[in-house]
């Protein structure tokens, strides 16, 4: 019991007071505008000019916003009148102002709450002298590890982390990290107001869906804190169910600009939960070989143990969410499968274990005999069906995979249209470079290439055949990666559609720190 209480003891040194005054600083919102609102780095978000404002007008709106936050009666009028959006100074029908102000506040607030964690990132890395820690942020960093480890495991559990999450639970989780009471009150007030402004993001019971296309930076941070709280309990259970010494290392994969190591996320209420339930069931089984990986709302748990052992872990997770987070979680959302005959979807790949049998004839004196050798290989494939569904949602093709034009891009220049399609194709090729079978990826490239030609033909009111003949090799080269372009210069005639290496050659890149948008949509 003393060991359990010591493990859950709160670390007050991590709490940072006096963050609330930062809400009234202009540079916070200027920083949020540069890092959050301007999403030119994403291929599925239009530039800010499309919404009708630029950096100059946004600066004026920031000053107006700070002035309104200073007015104390302004908050009271906003709470008393739920039909009028007084927090932004306009009625609900003025979508531009409500959308801009709420987005600006959420982005600025996200930067403020990230400050306590950003200050703690440099010192732990220097103290422990972790070499090339930036490589650990890569999503592809997980696959070489899976290649080496999954060959020796028996079962895999596909876990869907439950959402939506009630707003009060999110605020209570942050109370363990931040002791600035005004800031927490402002967060609670903002989330309730955000529920009134954007009812399509939040359900009627005031729970937040965190995987919408329009999910803001603040909600990504709140989701990370929620998942870290869940994984903290799992780390505790893992430490006490293993014979071996366990070291946890966690990354915030959902945040592109925020990377952290969390070791102590504590809550006193959790002691009661663990003592009441886990203390009776945890010590009844041990699992010395278990691995856990997560990205966004999906996690996998692989083990060398038996099916009964995996079921015990399954019900531990179910009870965790029901008793601690007060979330009714159905057990069917956790699937237990045998690795030898099951493919699981994770990080944009369909992964499985392939068994290859080879026969060798041996001759010894007058006797000859055959030796059958069975080898197991970790295989990763491109989920073609999922990607086609994502392309159809993004209006690049139909559900059946037939390419269509992109009408929203017809206002761009020809070079701009070709560059956008080419960038999407190159990003997909870069992300799925670890696939052992790339034929499916070539089909995705064909859909994007023909969709680009149809978009250009629609813009100029011409035929696809005309533009294919006019652009020729230029249109083709835009859809090559750098490696494919180098190979096309060497063998321009022998290979009409050059490939980088063999069909089964797998390359894992350590510079990919977020999932491709098309993969994320699937």
Swiss-Prot record:
Any GO BP: tRNA processing
Compartment(s) where it occurs, according to its Swiss-Prot or TrEMBL record: Plastid, Chloroplast
Superkingdom: Eukaryota
Coiled coil segments of this chain: none
Pfam family, one: Intron_maturas2
Entry GO terms, CC: chloroplast
Gene Ontology molecular function, alphabetical: RNA binding
Keywords of this entry: Chloroplast, mRNA processing, Plastid, RNA-binding, tRNA processing
Cross-referenced HAMAP family: MatK (MF_01390)
Role description: Usually encoded in the trnK tRNA gene intron. Probably assists in splicing its own and other chloroplast group II introns.
Family listed: Belongs to the intron maturase 2 family. MatK subfamily.
Listed name of the protein: Maturase K
Gene from which this protein is expressed: matK
């Amino acid at each position: 019991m003393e060991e359990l209480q010591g493990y859950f003891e709160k670390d007050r040194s991590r709490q940072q007071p006096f963050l609330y005054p930062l809400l009234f600083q202009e540079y916070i919102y200027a920083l949020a505008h540069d890092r959050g609102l301007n999403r030119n780095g994403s291929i599925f978000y239009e530039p800010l000019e499309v919404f009708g404002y630029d950096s100059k007008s946004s600066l004026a709106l920031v000053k107006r916003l700070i002035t309104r936050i200073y007015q104390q009666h302004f908050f009271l009028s906003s709470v008393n009148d739920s039909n009028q959006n007084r927090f932004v100074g306009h009625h609900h029908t003025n979508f531009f102002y409500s959308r801009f102000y709420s987005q600006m506040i959420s982005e600025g607030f996200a930067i403020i709450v990230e400050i306590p964690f950003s200050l703690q990132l440099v010192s732990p890395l220097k103290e422990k002298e972790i070499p090339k820690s930036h490589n650990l942020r890569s999503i592809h960093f997980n696959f070489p590890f899976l290649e080496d480890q999954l060959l020796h495991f028996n079962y895999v559990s596909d876990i869907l982390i439950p959402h939506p999450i009630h707003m009060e639970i999110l605020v209570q989780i942050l109370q363990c990290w931040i002791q600035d009471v005004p800031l927490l009150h402002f967060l609670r007030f903002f989330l309730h107001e955000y529920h009134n402004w954007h009812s399509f993001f939040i359900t009627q019971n005031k729970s937040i869906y965190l995987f919408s296309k329009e999910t803001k930076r603040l909600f990504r941070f709140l989701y990370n804190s929620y998942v870290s709280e869940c994984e903290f309990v799992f780390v505790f259970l893992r430490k006490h169910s293993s014979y071996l010494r366990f070291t946890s290392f966690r990354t915030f994969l959902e945040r592109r600009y925020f990377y952290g190591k969390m070791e102590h996320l504590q809550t006193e209420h959790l002691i009661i939960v663990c003592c009441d339930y886990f203390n009776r069931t945890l010590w009844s089984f041990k699992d010395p070989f278990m691995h856990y990986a997560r990205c966004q709302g999906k996690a996998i748990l692989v083990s060398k143990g038996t099916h009964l052992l995996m079921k015990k872990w399954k019900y531990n997770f179910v009870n965790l969410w029901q008793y601690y987070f007060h979330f009714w979680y159905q057990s069917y959302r956790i699937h237990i499968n045998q690795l030898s005959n099951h493919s699981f979807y994770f990080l944009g790949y369909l992964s499985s274990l392939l068994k290859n049998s080879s026969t060798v004839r041996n001759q010894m004196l007058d006797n000859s005999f055959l030796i059958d050798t069975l080898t197991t290989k970790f295989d990763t494939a491109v989920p073609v069906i999922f990607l086609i569904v994502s392309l159809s949602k993004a209006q690049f093709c139909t559900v059946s995979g037939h390419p269509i034009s992109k009408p929203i891009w017809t206002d761009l220049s020809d070079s701009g249209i070709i560059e956008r399609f080419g960038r999407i194709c190159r990003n997909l090729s870069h992300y799925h470079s670890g696939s052992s079978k790339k034929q499916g990826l070539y089909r995705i490239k064909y859909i994007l290439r023909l969709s680009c030609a149809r978009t250009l033909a629609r813009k100029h009111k011409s035929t696809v055949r005309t533009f294919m003949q006019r652009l020729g090799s230029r249109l083709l080269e835009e859809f090559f990666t750098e490696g494919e372009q180098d190979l096309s210069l060497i063998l321009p005639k022998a290979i009409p559609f050059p490939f980088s290496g063999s069909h089964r050659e797998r390359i894992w890149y350590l510079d990919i720190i977020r999932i491709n948008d098309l993969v994320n949509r699937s």
